[in-house]
């Protein structure tokens, strides 16, 4: 036995030495960025070093327009497509990126669970050659550049056509990618997420079209938020589920509502249980775009924080807070999925929107945005004039005073923030 052990040890050393040589050769001259994954930049290639202990973990990939040459359909700040839930697996030669299928669920203690697994496996979305192992063999090195600079439908800057396009016979903007005019601009890596910025050029009807896209890869928590079932009598955005079980007669159609996960701090738990108001571990923070004129921002912040009284009803004070975009934080990026933002969009469209991004496994809202369309000022002016001018002398003029318009913008802010909290129109 001793002799056998002595003959096996040099082989292990040779394997480690080989991995080190291969690793150094592949990444010679690389610029390395540390974070959730190490990213090694070698010329125009971006090598991701994915730890083996993250195989099988759930990630979300979101794609947002950061700038655009044509905001006909999608404006800067919007996500044209829903984020994608993915997980990674590996064999000896490749890393596989699977689309995680979470709509269908099954009781794991049920006899039918084996059949469920056979019928609802996670499909392979992309596959990448393992270029090398890390020197200690704890991570795989793969080239993921193509995911960000090719025409991947899930990351497209063009929105999908909807029923209104069909009914109104309007055409959504479409185009073909001009690869020679597209490139990765850079990456930022953090402990739980990576941001990738790309310049994407397309040929569309009427000429060229260029966008800067920000792709976010975020590691989702292993322990998911406890879902709350939807009720059709209460208007929440939700995640549709199908639950297979032998404990009920037939398939169950369920919904998980989209909601923020507010929890008391451990040291405040007993006070919270006694009915005292406490601050949550992680308050909901909205960053207000400094491109919004100064005279409107305070009204908008008040509209955001008008929701504080609602959270006080469930035991939390200062649960929702409004702040300006940070001036001196180099890591702040409104397109980073960690930040909820109230964004200014310059457009002739008279509108405002409050989309949010939720973990489809549980309905937990991860991030919300309000898109403040600049020309909503005109809409608010017309609404208030038509609806209240007979009783309100302040609105019988071509230009409202700041207080009158500010109060209208406060109303819009409260309305749109309600959407980002998961609430639909009532």
Where are these regions (language model features)?
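Active-site recognition of the HExxH zinc-binding catalytic motif
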Residues: 302-308, 363, 411-425
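Solvent-exposed, acidic/flexible segments
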Residues: 293-300, 304, 402-410
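Zn2+-dependent metallopeptidase catalytic core
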Residues: 55, 295-319
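Auxiliary tRNA-acceptor-end handling modules of aminoacyl-tRNA synthetases
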Residues: 2-46, 51-292, 325-380, 384-402, ...
């Amino acid at each position: 036995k001793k002799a056998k052990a002595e003959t096996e040890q040099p082989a292990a050393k040779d394997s480690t030495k080989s991995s080190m040589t291969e690793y150094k050769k592949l990444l010679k001259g690389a610029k390395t960025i540390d974070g959730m994954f190490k990213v090694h930049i070698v010329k125009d290639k971006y090598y991701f070093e994915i730890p083996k202990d993250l195989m099988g973990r759930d990630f979300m990939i979101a794609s947002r327009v950061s700038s655009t040459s044509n905001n006909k359909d999608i404006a800067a700040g919007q996500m044209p497509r829903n984020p994608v839930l993915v997980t990674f697996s590996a064999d000896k030669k490749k890393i596989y990126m699977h689309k995680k299928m979470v709509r269908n669920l099954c009781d794991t203690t049920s006899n039918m669970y084996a059949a469920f697994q056979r019928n609802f496996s996670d499909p392979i979305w992309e596959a990448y050659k393992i270029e090398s192992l890390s020197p200690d063999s704890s991570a795989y090195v793969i080239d993921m550049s193509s995911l960000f600079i090719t025409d991947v439908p899930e990351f497209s800057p063009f929105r999908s056509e909807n029923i209104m396009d069909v009914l109104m016979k309007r055409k959504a903007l479409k185009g073909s990618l001009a690869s020679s005019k597209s490139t990765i601009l850079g990456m930022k890596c953090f402990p739980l997420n990576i941001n990738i910025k790309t310049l994407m050029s397309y040929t569309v009807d009427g000429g060229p079209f260029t966008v800067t896209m920000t792709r976010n890869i975020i590691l989702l928590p292993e322990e998911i938020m406890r879902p709350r079932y939807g009720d059709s009598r209460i208007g929440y955005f939700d995640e549709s589920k199908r639950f297979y079980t032998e404990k009920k007669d037939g398939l169950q159609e369920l919904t998980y509502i989209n909601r923020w996960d507010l929890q008391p701090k451990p040291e405040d738990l007993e006070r919270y249980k006694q009915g005292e108001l406490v601050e949550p571990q992680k308050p909901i923070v909205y960053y207000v775009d400094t491109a919004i004129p100064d005279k409107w921002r305070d009204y908008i912040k008040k509209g955001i924080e008008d929701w504080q009284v609602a959270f006080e009803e469930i035991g939390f004070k200062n649960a929702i807070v409004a702040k300006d975009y940070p001036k001196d934080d180099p890591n702040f990026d409104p397109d980073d999925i960690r930040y909820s933002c109230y964004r200014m969009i310059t457009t002739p469209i008279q509108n405002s929107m409050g989309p949010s991004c939720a973990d489809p496994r549980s309905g937990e809202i991860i991030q919300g945005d309000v898109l403040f369309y600049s020309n909503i000022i005109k809409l608010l002016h017309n609404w208030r004039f038509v609806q209240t001018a007979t009783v309100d002398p302040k609105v019988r003029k071509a230009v409202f005073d700041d207080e009158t318009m500010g109060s209208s913008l406060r109303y819009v802010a409260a309305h749109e923030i309600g959407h980002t909290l998961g609430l639909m129109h009532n």
